[in-house]
């Protein structure tokens, strides 16, 4: 989901509340739990977003979600506020914005690393070390296996794509030969 000024504002406020207590990671984990609950049970989201549902029913539903997911008071309040202001539609963007802002606070850079086969620990460490050297932040790798890459790796980090795959090399060569 695309970031908006609204989602960014809520995410920034949430980071400001979580950071002093060292709760940035646990807050993100809880945000992911809420996101998964909405994804697994779309009716839950629809009920909360419904303007026709009685306030006491919504309060009970929010209380039930908070208890079931063992949410912090801050996240219970956030859900209530988003529901009350009819801004639940921004929740996914808020989660993405929160992750980005929390990473800045924690000095992290996230990288999606795609390869044709699983990477061994030594290669993962080498990639992480190079990214840390390049960006000056601790790298968190999100690994994915995509057999269609044929070989090599593609790294997506900080809005950039570093493509060292055989597939992209073959594509470049074909373009060169066709020109």
From Swiss-Prot:
Its main location: membrane. SUPFAM superfamilies: N-terminal domain of the delta subunit of the F1F0-ATP synthase. GO terms for molecular function: proton-transporting ATP synthase activity, rotational mechanism. It is found in: Cell inner membrane. InterPro entries: ATP_synth_OSCP/delta_N_sf (IPR026015), ATPase_OSCP/dsu (IPR000711). Transmembrane segments: none annotated. It comes from the Bacteria. It is a peripheral membrane protein. Belongs to the ATPase delta chain family. This is ATP synthase subunit delta 2. It comes from Syntrophotalea carbinolica (strain DSM 2380 / NBRC 103641 / GraBd1) (Pelobacter carbinolicus). The gene is atpH2.
